[in-house]
A protein has these predicted regions:
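Thioredoxin-like thiol-disulfide oxidoreductase module
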Residues: 244-270
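Bacterial signal peptide processing site
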Residues: 28-30
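N-terminal secretory signal peptides
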Residues: 1-9, 17-23, 33
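Non-globular targeting/processing and membrane-anchoring segments
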Residues: 32-200
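Short active-site neighborhood of thiol/selenol oxidoreductases, capturing the structured segment around
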Residues: 197-213
Length: 291
């Protein structure tokens, strides 16, 4: 791990170069931002998408399923705002059809370094296209655009689908991963492979993340949060890394060859991702980007 620290590059640069992307700091170039009542520049705040918005990278938001879109509040200095935040932000969601609905983005901050505001929505399957989040208040006036696509346009696993069988490394079989866990002290969630977990009739939790490269202010300690949860022996909990041999990234190895099989099999172009499946292997919940 010390070698990883010496040669580390921000992890969002890694996956972006491989045709994927780490998305927590992404922001649509089509966002409209304006201050109200001549707010001093030092007091200006604006929302940034913490997800694939469809402009800077392919969207992963789909129609016909419940979706979650986290936003971060930034200041004039270009840094995320972490103090003095409102508990919620109200706005209006304009759908591709032109229909609008009132929305409330609640603040989430427990256990994470940078609070975010969560937009939860579900739109009909015919409503693919550009959505607009319009916010107009004394503190914040802004329009943020993002794309919502059809489920057939992405290979990302969806709630209700069957888990996909793929090998993940364990303490007894590294499956070519070195290290199998980039946490400073490897976590305990490598006792069973995902392939075996999906064949034993037990519910499964799969966390895809790379804790050793968490180097941005909006990167939450998602693995640590999972470690702190009470253990239930009825569940199989698996942590899967993003790269098979991250040390080789600094050596100039083709990144596509280092992307782990679980990333490819589950259609991800981001991390972290938290997936919960029942004993029937059906996906019951999926949390992306920020928890």
């Amino acid at each position: 791990f010390s070698e990883l620290q010496k040669h580390s590059i921000p992890r969002r640069s890694f996956i972006a170069s491989a045709g994927c992307a780490f998305l927590l700091s992404s922001c649509s170039s089509r966002q409209g931002e304006s201050s109200k009542n001549s707010v001093p520049i030092d007091n200006v705040r604006f929302l940034r998408a913490g997800f694939a918005d469809g402009f800077t990278m392919p969207s992963t938001l789909v129609t016909g399923r419940p979706q979650r879109a986290p936003f971060f509040l930034y200041g004039a200095d270009g840094l995320p705002v972490v103090n003095g935040l409102p508990l919620e932000i109200s706005g209006e969601l304009i759908l591709p059809s032109g229909r609008s609905e009132k929305v409330l983005l609640s603040q989430h901050s427990e256990g994470i370094p940078t609070p975010y505001f969560l937009l939860e929505f579900e739109i009909s399957e015919e409503n693919t296209g550009i959505c607009q989040l319009q916010v107009d208040s004394q503190e914040l006036t802004q329009i943020v655009e993002f794309r919502v696509i059809a489920q057939t346009e992405t290979d990302l696993i969806q709630v209700g689908e069957t888990m996909r069988v793929v090998d993940t490394p364990t303490f007894t079989n590294s499956a070519g991963f070195d290290p199998l866990c980039t946490r400073y002290e490897p976590c305990s969630f490598h006792n069973i492979s995902l392939r075996d977990a999906l064949s034993n009739g037990r519910p499964t939790i799969l966390l895809v993340s790379t804790p050793g490269f968490c180097q941005t202010t909006v990167c939450g300690p998602v693995l640590e949060l999972l470690i702190e949860l009470p253990k239930d022996p009825k569940w199989d909990v698996i942590h899967a890394e993003v790269y098979t041999e991250p040390k080789k990234i600094a050596e100039g190895t083709d990144l596509q060859k280092l992307i782990s099989p679980v990333i490819q099999t589950y259609g991800m172009n981001f991390e972290p991702c938290f997936i919960v499946a029942g004993s029937d292997n059906r996906v019951e919940a999926r949390l992306d980007y920020a928890f």
